[in-house]
A protein has these predicted regions:
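DNA-contacting interfaces and partner/effector-binding or oligomerization modules
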Residues: 45, 52, 56-201
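N-terminal, positively charged regions that mediate nucleic acid binding
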Residues: 1-40, 44-58
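Extended mid-to-C-terminal alpha-helical interaction segments
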Residues: 190-290
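Short, solvent-exposed alpha-helical "recognition" segments
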Residues: 289-299
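Structural motif
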Residues: 15-23, 111-118, 248-252
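Short acidic, hydrophobic short linear motifs in intrinsically disordered regions
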Residues: 36-42, 136-138, 268-270
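Short, hydrophobic/amphipathic alpha-helical patches that form generic packing surfaces
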Residues: 24-32, 120-128, 259
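Short acidic (Asp/Glu) and glycine-rich catalytic loops that position anionic groups and cofactors
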Residues: 34-37, 134, 167, 234-239
Length: 299
């Protein structure tokens, strides 16, 4: 199950209690659904929970009934339609529209006077025309409608509620979207999906922890590579000295450091210092090993 479906399932568990909120949610559905005309209302969804909620929602809001829902075999999408003229008139009348005139869709803010109704409207819009990506991959939530005027007015409504949505045109549709995780969390909480918002927060924390671990691993790997490279340089220098002069030409302390390094080719400087007898400091041993790497060049 996709994250978007999980979000919609959670939204569909919000009770249909107040009549005004049911009307507002249905309004959001209609303005963001497949078809909303004076001849037909058609809602297409792949979400089972949303398909089950719609008949209850429209009965609560308008007393309207859908034609027997059809489930498409290809893709498993549900198609719910209303074609009865009287039912469509009832729906349009609820939003102050007159079917005898050409209908250009706009958001009637009179239907969304209270904050709970605005949240319900946005919930309906998301259920019908929204999607959100899996937060473990990236952050993106969008609302898609074929009505540019509706999208502009929805953007203004979101701004009033404290959300700054961006807008783009995608073919014949207009898209409002969020890409910041905090905005998506707040939006989902607003429309009734606080658990989904918490999932995004958890995913963000997990990402941050994984990034920290990766940075530490990369840093440790880089440090290990440096240790190996330095040790190899020292061993190469010691082998050259041994080949060209013999280690006996070295002062006792340098000879001791050379033999210690040859015997422990993968040891770090700190480990070598602890293995020295008598023990020496890291800086002291580092000085001796540096003298060894310079010995051949200076000779």
């Amino acid at each position: 199950m996709s994250f978007a479906t999980e979000v919609k399932n959670e939204l569909c568990r919000v009770p249909l209690s107040r009549h005004c909120c049911a009307v507002a949610e249905a309004y959001g559905v209609l303005l963001y659904c497949h078809t909303f005309t004076t001849r037909e209302i058609r809602i297409v969804t792949a979400c089972d929970a949303f398909a089950e909620r719609l008949p209850k929602l429209f009965r609560r809001a308008f007393g309207a009934h859908f034609v027997l829902p059809v489930t498409e075999k290809a893709g498993g999408r549900h198609v719910l339609t209303i074609t009865d003229r009287a039912a469509i008139e009832t729906v349009f009348a609820a939003f102050g529209a007159d079917l005898s005139r050409t209908v250009a869709h706009h958001i009637n803010l009179g239907v969304l006077e209270s904050d709970c109704c605005r949240a319900s409207f946005l919930r309906g819009a998301f259920l019908a025309g929204g999607s959100v990506t899996d937060p473990s991959k990236n952050y993106h939530l969008e609302l898609i409608t074929a009505h540019a005027s509706v999208s502009r007015e929805a953007a203004a409504l979101l701004t009033e509620l404290g959300f700054a949505a961006r807008s783009i045109d995608r073919g014949a549709n207009t898209v409002l979207y969020f890409k910041k995780s905090e905005a998506i969390e707040d939006f989902l909480t607003k429309i009734g999906a606080p658990c989904a918002a918490m999932d995004i927060m958890s995913a963000k924390v997990e990402k941050s922890m994984n990034n920290s671990i990766n940075r530490k691993v990369n840093c440790d790997t880089a440090n290990a590579d440096k240790v190996v490279a330095a040790a190899q340089e020292q061993i190469d220098a010691i082998r050259r000295i041994e080949r060209d002069y013999g280690l006996d030409v070295l002062p006792e302390k340098l000879q001791s450091a050379a033999l210690l390094r040859i015997a422990n080719p993968e040891a770090s400087l700190a480990d070598l210092a602890m293995l020295s007898y008598p023990p020496v400091t890291k800086s002291c041993l580092n000085y001796r090993l540096k003298k060894l790497t310079e010995f051949h060049m200076d000779d």
